[in-house]
Amino acid sequence: PRSKYFAWDNFRRFQQSWGMANGMEREDFQELMNTHKEAHAIHYKRDFSPEQMRELALNYKQAVESRGFGIPEDPWEQLIGAVDMVFDSWHTPKAEEYRRLMGVSDDWGTAVIVQAMVFGNLGLQSGSGVLFTAHPYRKVRRVALWGDYAIGDQGEDIVSGLVTSHPISVEQAEIDGRDENKSLERRFPNTYQRLLSISRELVYDKEWNPQEIEFTFEGAEAEQLYILQTRDMITIKKKEH
């Protein structure tokens, strides 16, 4: 049953991503989600049955098609369409304003990376998160993992603030007054230790600046962790050379 839920959840997410890339608003889909939760007396979407998730996914599909943005059946057409959307994003008002403020040429264009996807929404032993390798409140030189993660969700859910998230470390939970038993360090110790090891390697061994790391894990074992992106923390003053 969980695999059916997973399949329909991904179908739902695909419909929403495609629709939003074509100009639909997140609220268009959130309204459908809220209505569906209310109809089935559900608080968290992970509590939908596979059939209920199927119904919601098809509602998303209908909403996208009603706006003229239906997804083509041919996977190759889907891929080419997705690539074209990324290219077109270079010309959005937000992107143009950013380039103007940052002094970036309009002639550069953008690249498109096509890669395999990993799934934080596989089940209750999977999840996604964002962490910082430096303490946000105290000036300490050691690596200290700080951030948020969610179980059974994708990274976009966390970044958008759509789901209830939990602290990364026990130290963070104690300082923030949150439940340390829900921290990644307590619930998924193998994942936490692997992230700590990677963070120390980047900061101590490679001498990178403090990092902001996005990650997904498809299971509770260390080898099921995937680093999606890492970049310099913008809240930390970079080292002077």
List where the protein language model places each region.
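Nucleotide/phosphate-binding sheet-loop regions of phosphoryl- and nucleotidyl-transfer enzymes
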Residues: 1-241
